[in-house]
Amino acid sequence: MDKTDKPCCSFCGAEKSPTVPLIAGNDGRICEACVKLAHQVVSSWGQRRKNQQLAPQLRTPVEYKKHLDESVIGQEAAKETLSVAVYNHYLRLLNCDREPVCQLGEQVELEKSNILMAGPSGTGKTLLVRTLARILGVPFAMADATTLTQAGYVGDDVDSIITRLLDAAGGDVQQAQWGIVYIDEVDKLAKRSGGGTAVRDISGEGVQQALLKMVEGTEVRISKSGRRNEHSEEQVVDTRNILFIAGGAFPGLEALVSSRIQPKNTGIGFHAQPRREAPSINELMASLLPDDLHEFGLIPEFIGRFPIITFLQELDHATLLRILTEPRNALVKQYKQLFAYQGVELVITDAALNYIADQALIRKTGARGLRAVLEAALQQTMFNMPSQPQLRGCTLDLVEHEDGGRSLEVLTRLAEDGSGRIQPDPSPVVEEKSALSADL
């Protein structure tokens, strides 16, 4: 370059001026605009490398469902919906920098599709999402909507969700931006009904409003120190590519669906419609629409951020029985492993398993009720077991009493003492009547 010429950017040729400062190097200069462009190019290279690392982990929806089948029993429709949604989401991210396909002739920007899951407590909502995140190998964060508050209230603000996701990613912003966030108990953010009038929960609606931009896609500034002050260094997390999944029990939602699809019978006498058998909750929720969620109390803008809606079915006795024994980490397998660590073999009879499933149905807490019943039945045995080195086996069985009652009892087998007999364990039994009274 001629020394008589004005200094200019070696990349774009922009001349140095009060508004265009230049950074000088050994053999040239660069302006601020070209620095930003270079940063975008280098960042794109890094993103492509991350895409290549994630690409081998992207499997087909069929493969995702097979993995979910190993951990979650039943819920076929929900598992298929989640598998397709997750596959499409990460397929979109892997091809975001790809050249336009020849059939379209232009680049089409794909919008992300967040997911809302409705279903009774204990049906596997959290387990499904956590399992998918583990299969994908992406950061995962879970937030309880009941702890979130809008600005000006005491509690966790919505930005704390991204802070947890960033922590799960080890502080790597790029990795966090490909993560999954699960917001549980979103039904608690809905309006509350009192008497004949619907009273809107101001705090809950405020949280819904605060979540809108984050769920849709925005830049969230997170302090590296975790504390908010003027001097703390910040990290910027773009939420456009974060998959948000919301879940909740939505008690009473089935009644809203029923009132929509089954109008009241106002006929009299011969004009009255014949009474039909009331549909089950699962049949009603198969007809769930966004309008029903709005009627429940979620604002339309919040519902619109979750275009994919799926329902998890209420668990019946047969499904609870399978949950006890079939999954990879089935509850019975866990307790057998726990006993095996202490050199004791645990056997649970079929009659006991059926009784445990019955009691879980009475508690109305889904799969969580199974652990509660089994823990109560084995608690005293587990208390005494470390102090009984001669103990070699335990059998949990259902005992029928003369008065018609039933209870779970543990029979223990000691080390060889010449008789090899099985004797009752001095453990309190779990009686059917006590479980019923507790539920009432």
UniProtKB/Swiss-Prot annotation:
One of its GO terms (biological process) is proteolysis involved in protein catabolic process. PROSITE patterns: CLPX_ZB. Gene3D superfamilies: 1.10.8.60, ClpX chaperone, C4-type zinc finger domain (6.20.220.10), P-loop containing nucleotide triphosphate hydrolases (3.40.50.300). ATP binds at residues 120-127. Keywords: ATP-binding, Chaperone, Metal-binding, Nucleotide-binding, Zinc. Residues 417-440 are annotated as: Disordered. Disulfide bonds: none annotated. Zn(2+) binds at residues 9, 12, 31, 34. Residues 1-50 form the ClpX-type ZB domain. GO terms for molecular function: ATP binding; ATP hydrolysis activity; ATP-dependent protein folding chaperone; protein dimerization activity; unfolded protein binding; zinc ion binding. PANTHER family: ATP-DEPENDENT CLP PROTEASE ATP-BINDING SUBUNIT CLPX-LIKE, MITOCHONDRIAL, ATP-DEPENDENT CLP PROTEASE ATP-BINDING SUBUNIT CLPX-LIKE, MITOCHONDRIAL-RELATED. Belongs to the ClpX chaperone family. ATP-dependent specificity component of the Clp protease. It directs the protease to specific substrates. Can perform chaperone functions in the absence of ClpP. Component of the ClpX-ClpP complex. Forms a hexameric ring that, in the presence of ATP, binds to fourteen ClpP subunits assembled into a disk-like structure with a central cavity, resembling the structure of eukaryotic proteasomes. NCBIfam families: clpX, PRK05342.1. This is ATP-dependent Clp protease ATP-binding subunit ClpX. It comes from Azotobacter vinelandii.
